[in-house]
A protein has these predicted regions:
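Secondary-structure junction motif
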Residues: 110-132, 198-206, 215-216, 220
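Hydrophobic hinge/microswitch elements
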Residues: 47-52, 56-60, 65, 116-175
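Alpha-helical linker/hinge and terminal dimerization helices associated
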Residues: 1-5
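Short, well-ordered beta-strand segments
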Residues: 11-15, 63, 87, 111, ...
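Central regulatory/effector-binding core of bacterial HTH transcription factors
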Residues: 9-72, 142
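A late-sequence structural motif
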Residues: 24, 175-218
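Beta-alpha-beta core module
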Residues: 72-78, 82-83, 97, 146-195
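Flexible hinge/capping segments at coil-to-helix
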Residues: 6, 74-84, 88-110, 193-194, ...
């Protein structure tokens, strides 16, 4: 009712999980507002399990998360991928490496996202960590990227994050280094119910691909390196 009173003719409810970087949506949402100002766009930050339930229950029209393991009745389409980097505090001994071997990373404590709040991110990181025969030492599990990088900056632990997340944080005390070898990628997926989309949703999905294709590519070498 309030949306109609404000002059909106349609609504698009978008769920975000796994700490999806808000800057990824700036160009997309700006384009939506320019093309269809009559569409009321609502964003909801929720855990992945809640997003999936909400999509099934028609609480959300579409969502973004870092997992394609969403069960029956939900479609997961890759939207974009981000190179994984190691977030390292300034003046840390690992900064002698331009590309850090994963087994060297695991010699130090890690700060991770809460697996309940960042389920998809946690699954992708767990798969990467299983590629070496070393048990990670998890110093802390946190609810936000900001707190994760604050702990890194303070020297408590290292973290594994997407390069665009690290670039967006603008913290001079946190330096990004790619992993040695072929850099793993963190993939973000667009999730929606496996039904014919509404015209409004269909136009939104059509906008995602060109926005993502035209987005700057964050290669590991472009990741912020300060005082190194």
């Amino acid at each position: 009712m309030r949306a109609a009173a404000a002059g909106y003719q349609a609504q698009l409810r978008i769920a975000l999980s796994d700490g999806i970087t808000p800057s990824r949506f700036t160009a997309l949402l700006a384009q939506c507002r320019q093309d269809e100002p009559e569409v009321d766009i609502r964003l909801y930050e929720v855990p992945l399990s809640q997003q999936i339930r909400g999509l099934h229950d028609d609480l959300y029209d579409v969502g973004f998360a870092q997992s394609a393991e969403v069960g029956e009745g939900i479609l997961a389409e890759a939207a974009w991928s981000d190179p994984l980097v190691v977030a390292v505090p300034a003046r840390h001994p690992l900064l002698t490496y331009k590309r850090i071997p994963l087994d060297e990373v695991l010699r130090y404590p890690l700060v991770m996202c809460d697996p309940q709040l960042c389920e998809g991110y946690g699954r992708q990181i767990a798969r990467i960590l299983r590629t070496v025969d070393v048990e990670p030492l998890v110093a802390e599990e946190v609810a936000s990227l900001d707190l994760m990088l604050a702990l890194v900056a303070a020297g408590y632990a290292l973290a594994l994050v997407g390069s665009s997340q690290l670039i967006a944080c603008r913290n001079a005390d946190v330096i990004g280094r790619p992993l040695a070898g072929r850099s793993p990628m963190l993939t973000t997926y667009l999730l929606r119910r496996d039904v014919e989309p509404s015209e409004t949703l269909s136009r939104f999905i059509d906008r995602v691909s060109p926005i993502i294709t035209d987005a700057p590519s964050h290669t590991p070498e472009s990741t912020k390196e300060i005082n190194s």
